[in-house]
Every structure is written in C-alpha cells, then in structure tokens.
Amino acid sequence: MDSNRINRAGSPEAPMEYVRSQEHHDLFRQAVNAVGGSVAAPAPAKAPIWSSSAPYGSFSRDGYSWNNDVWGRGAGPQTISVYGANQWSVWSNQPATGGIKSYPHEAVHVGKPLSAINTLSSTFTQDVPKGGAWDTAYDIWDSSNQHEIMIWTNYTGNPDGSGNVKPISYHYRQDPSGAAIPVYRNVQVGGTTWNVFEGNNGHNVISLVPISKSNSGTVDIKGILEWIKSKGYFGDINVGSVQYGVEITSSPGGMNFKFSNWAVTSK
C-alpha cells in the first residue's frame, strides 16, 4: 500500500474483443436521433423501442442491456425508456428522504483479465436536472461481484464528500457536514483530477469523485483500474460488466435524466 494513503482497503472480474460504438449498430441506426458529440442530448422525438416502469424491468439488444433497477427502501415510481443503442432516458419521482432509491443504467459485458486489456474507455453525454439528489456514475464489477469501482461524472453533492449525496466510505466527519473522508485527494488519472473514497456495502467499493463535474466526456477506465491496482487494492482482476447510469436519492415531483452517445471501447 502507498505511504500517501489517508485511510485503508480495496478490489474487481468475466470473454471477447470488441468495440462498442454507435457506428457499429446498424440495427439501431434508424432508432437513434442525431446528436452532437459535445452537447447534452435533446428530448428524443420518437417513441421508445422499449420502456418499463417495473422495478427491475430489463431489456437487452445488440450487446447492450438496460435495467430500471429500483431497489431502495421507500422508492417511488420510475420509468426507463430506450430509443436506441446509445440513447435512453429515465423519469423518476423519488421522495426527499435519505438513501439511494434506484440506479437505472445501461451496461456492456467486458469479460477479460485486466492484463489482457490494452484499451478500456468510455464516452458519455447527458442532460440532467438541477434539483434533487443524485450522481451519474459508472459502476464497474469484477466477475465475482466482490469488488465494485464507481466513477462519478456529475453529482449534486460536493467533491470533498459532503452535500446531499456522498460516496460510500469507512469514515465520515463527525460534524454537521457528515462528509465522507477520502483516502486520496487530488489524484490525476486519465486527464481528470479525483478524490478517492473507500468503503464496503457488502462489496469492496472504491469511488472516484471528480473535482470538476461534467455532462460529457471520455473516461479512461483502463487507466483508472491500473492506478487502483498500483495502490495494492487488487491484482490482475477479471473485469466483468461496465455500467453507466444515475444513482437517484431524491427527485421530488418527477425529474428527467437523458443519456446519449454512450459507448464502451475495449480491445
């Protein structure tokens, strides 16, 4: 372990070289609205190809999968809608109470040892509300589901671990902020500066929270996993699924989250 650590612990794993990108999905091409690569997606003009309000409603097509994933206590209604391979949205009406209510998301399966991956990166574009309590994040699992890596992109809390959403942590400040305490601060990986948090929710969880919030960009997942490995959290893990969505704690009155241009490149 590194002598610069502020606290302590950590650990992600499942086959097949592929490149997931919008250009390679001819089956979906007519179902996807044209969107710019650097701006948030407009509201889809067409009817969805699939929609569900079931708590665990799920849909798979052409190597992608989606799940409504409403799992928290006291959760309200939520509807996920898919318009194409890289375009989907969720309407969610969650009460202003504590605790995550849902994590609607899109996912692809990687299924390779980290050492066998030369490139693992992802692009995202999103349109999010100003209110509520939520964080948009990648959720990356090893194949054994022992280790979970969360990479936040935007959130309603603060980068120091305070605010109305907080990353999982072993340690929280004993003051009114109740802020999660990072194990590393101002880490530069993949062109982004992060605060890093460590905790356990039944799995070993490492969360990277960017100092600057963003609604579009590219994430160097391979670089992040290698950095975590270099700190002794795990060895040559088998990277399982890469998910992207929004952890919703509250969205009173109903709020819309829209996602487009999401793609994962692995080779």
Q: For the regions a protein language model found, what residue spans apply to each?
A:
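Short, compositionally biased, intrinsically disordered N-terminal export/targeting signals
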Residues: 1-25, 29-37
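Extracellular carbohydrate-recognition regions
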Residues: 39-70, 155-157, 163-168
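Extracellular-facing segments of soluble proteins and assemblies that are Gly/Ser/Thr-biased and enriched
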Residues: 98-182
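Conserved, mostly hydrophobic/aromatic
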Residues: 191
